[in-house]
UniProtKB/Swiss-Prot annotation:
It comes from the Bacteria. This is Large ribosomal subunit protein bL32. The keyword Metal-binding does not apply. GO terms for cellular component: large ribosomal subunit.
Length: 60
């Protein structure tokens, strides 16, 4: 296992970690008006690209 030769400064550590942040997920609004993730089936109505993909029951 590799061992560092010199201590990394707080500045160098911060520069290395500057790209480690968590990305905020993109949100779009379905034709039913509910927010959903792009390229995924809408969890509330079950449509994808304007087509009914998942049959939703009314007893929910």
């Amino acid at each position: 296992m590799a061992v560092q030769q010199n201590k990394k400064s707080r500045s160098r550590k911060g520069m290395r970690r500057s790209h480690d942040r968590v990305a905020i997920p993109a949100v779009i609004y379905c034709s039913c008006g509910e927010p959903t993730v792009p390229h995924c089936v809408c969890p509330s109505c079950g449509t994808y690209k304007g087509r009914q993909v998942v049959a939703k029951s009314d007893n929910e």
